[in-house]
Amino acid sequence: GHYTEGDVKEAARVLTGWSINPLTNPFSTTFLNVNHDTTDKKFSAFYGNTVIKGQSGISAGNTELDDMLTMMFGVDEVALYMCRKLYEFFVYYEIDDTVETNVIGPLAKVFRDSGYDIKTVLKTLLMSEHFYDAWNRGCVIKDPITQQAGFCREMEVPFPASTDYYLLYKMWELGSTFGQLTQLNLGDPPNVAGWPAWYQKPMFHRSWINSDTLPKRNQFTDFLILVGYKVGTYTLQADPWVLTKQFSDPGTPDTLISEATNFLLPLALSTGQISGLKEILLPGGIPDYNWKDEYRAATDASDPNHTTALNTATSKLRNLYKAIMNLSEYQLS
């Protein structure tokens, strides 16, 4: 069973006398006992037919509110419901019987035993073996801000100094603009519930992707990889060498592509996709050693072909990362 309309009415009676003062910052609450319903409040079988004794006086509001919260959190369904919501947000929006039994149930017990401490239950979920299971990787589409911020972190895009307020504002403006273009205008949700992608069944996260937003998501990464955002003499742009040099053997095409895709993508690629990426480094099927020689010259300032090799290799790396981030797998987290 579930709570009833009568339960809602009784809860409203518990809250009589309370008001909000919007003139304070932050808002404050006030209890006026003369406006409080002092009669008993009777709840349904869902709450064990609990009766909250009516109180009077200046402490009546706190006393009855505490009694109601104790009653509400004494019902197992409260912890189960909240854990399902956490699971939908952080793991996946479909909860089958197996997940309900093996994950949600035990998680709800942890939640109750912790005194309903969100930090404890989140730590348990996010450190669980289930959370890192391969089946749960790449199953949620990134929201636009996660895609943007994730890209900047992955590519270690350098931002202006924290004291340069004008440039920083222009950088945030870029993010805000692309957020609006991809249907996440921060600070201006469509309604009080927020954005449907985080709550609306059955679409949930799939709402982020459509024929209009997908090209614009790709345009964001393309722009910062290939062109950069110029404000005066400052350019915000991803340097492909920063990430590339962190790999174990970037001079070997197969190693570079394998480690780059493992780092940037949640799912493994097909042989055909890997071949397509390799074609960027070795156009026309030329031997692997061509990239190895090019990479060596590009990273050795004393090499007589350094400048030419650096320009060519940089262009190839930019196109490689562009291609990886244009894959559908990059839209997943």
Model-found features: residue ranges?
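Non-catalytic, conformational "gating/processing" segments within enzyme and secreted inhibitor domains
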Residues: 1-97
